[in-house]
Curated annotation (Swiss-Prot):
It is a single-pass membrane protein. Its main location: membrane. This is Uncharacterized protein PM1095. The chain crosses the membrane at residues 12-34. It comes from Pasteurella multocida (strain Pm70). GO terms for cellular component: membrane.
Length: 57
């Protein structure tokens, strides 16, 4: 027999799992950005030289 409760429950679980996945991807991306020296240099107003890999203030 068709049950709206099961459909609703599975829908809520699907939406929540997508939300949790999106949040996890966001935090992994942010962690990778903080590890990127070029991005850190630009955050502090520096100029990053790709050739020498040095941050110039």
């Amino acid at each position: 027999m068709f049950s709206w409760k099961k459909v609703l429950f599975k829908g809520v679980i699907a939406v929540l799992s997508l939300f949790v996945f999106a949040v996890a991807v966001f935090f992994v991306g942010m962690a990778l950005l903080t590890l990127d020296p070029k991005d850190r240099c630009l955050d502090y107003g520096g100029r990053y030289d790709d050739a020498t890999k040095i941050c110039e203030k």
